From Swiss-Prot:
One Gene Ontology molecular-function label: DNA binding
UniProt subcellular location: Virion; Host nucleus, Host nucleolus
Keywords assigned: DNA-binding, Host nucleus, Late protein, Viral capsid assembly, Viral release from host cell, Virion
Taxonomy, superkingdom: Viruses
Predominant localisation class: virion
Protein name: Core-capsid bridging protein
GO biological process: one example: viral release from host cell
Cited function: Associates loosely with the viral DNA to form an outer shell around the nucleoprotein-DNA complex and links it with the capsid by binding the endosome lysis protein. Dissociates from the viral genome during entry. Might be involved in nuclear capsid assembly of the viral particles through its association with NPM1/nucleophosmin.
Miscellaneous information on this protein: All late proteins expressed from the major late promoter are produced by alternative splicing and alternative polyadenylation of the same gene giving rise to non-overlapping ORFs. A leader sequence is present in the N-terminus of all these mRNAs and is recognized by the viral shutoff protein to provide expression although conventional translation via ribosome scanning from the cap has been shut off in the host cell. This protein is only encoded by mastadenoviruses, and may therefore play a role in mammals tropism.
Entry's family note: Belongs to the adenoviridae core-capsid bridging protein family.
The keyword DNA-binding is assigned to this record: yes
Induction: Expressed in the late phase of the viral replicative cycle.
Pfam family, one: Adeno_PV
Amino acid sequence: MAAISRAIKQELLEDLKPEMYLPPKSTRRRAKVKTEEKVDVKTLVKSKSKKRRAAKNELEENVEFVRRFAPRRPYQWRGRQVRALPRPGIPVVFTPGQRSGVASKRSYDEVYADEDVLDQSGNMINEFAYGKRVKMLTHKNPTPSQVPITPQEPIARPGEARLLPTVQVLAPRDSKHETMLPVTKSEGGDVKVENKGFEQITPQLGVQTVDIKVPVKRKSEVEDEILKRAKMEPFETTVKMEYSEQPQVEVFDTGVEPSSFFEVRSQARPIAVARKRRVPTVEVMEVQQSDHTAPTASAAPVANVIVGPHLSRRPSRWGPANAIYPDYVYHPSISAKKIMGPRPTGRVSRWGPANSIFPEVRLHPSMVSAVTRAAPRKSTKSRRRRRVRTRRAFVLPAGTKTGVMLPQNIRYHPSILFRRA
């Protein structure tokens, strides 16, 4: 019933208010112009209509740009702080407890510079006195083919504060890789003095270059032969450093006596060695004369120079750490002797060295057959210690369910053991 009444209402509504999607009629009234032929009368057009026509024609003539530029991300000015950079000469005052506000707008003096700002920059005064790079007026090099050998050092002359002459020795660019041989100056008449004149380098610096050319010549042929022979002979050291006595070297091992692998680690006796303090040796410096010296010179005696004791760290009590060898076992496929360090000698400590603390190692039953008992070493000590042996408790032989016998002093999980009653 509801569906029928709804259909009736919809049909009535379409008759009364049909759904017509048409552009709405414009309510703008246009002036109707009545034209008559052969009438010499000017048509009356209202001023309001003239404005509308002019606006319409202007819209048609101009091209409309949808977007002139690419979209830009707006800069977030809110919350930004401007860092104040005061000009040189402005005192910066710090008031404790008072927060500095944001930079205010520039004053009139900061926007407009002084009238003679160019003269100030040229004379390097006021704000141009510091932190400004000097303008170079010329980069002329009067000696382009020469390279400096010595640094340019000033010559201090008393009484002349303004003039400060400097001296620098130059050499031809081609001879900089050659061996510098001793040279002698020729006669004084060959020296040439050339004045390059005064030249302004910077607005406040002028340089007057005076070149003094001194020709040089090599020494005699005998001296050249000596230099050539010295150059061809092999180089020999003239200073030798050696020890007056051999340094003492002590070797440390793990600190545990060689014993069977299947013994409990608590039964093995640790050994500690007290390291001896090394006496500082006296170093001898031997000075020798070279073989190619003059034959008239006598051989210089050997000078013994005693060097003071070398300050070093106090030696460790237990020896170097690289003498600690871990307890390891080879795979059954490897047949090699176990590396054992030499037996230590010296005092025996109560607790043993720190390098004797090793965890207990237990092997899988498949590796038991590859381990053999180490042969006891002969002790080189003159004094023997009496060892008290206690009878071990009787333990039934243990084996796995497959029949492999296990050592008696190692505890296994009950799930893999099989003991015969």
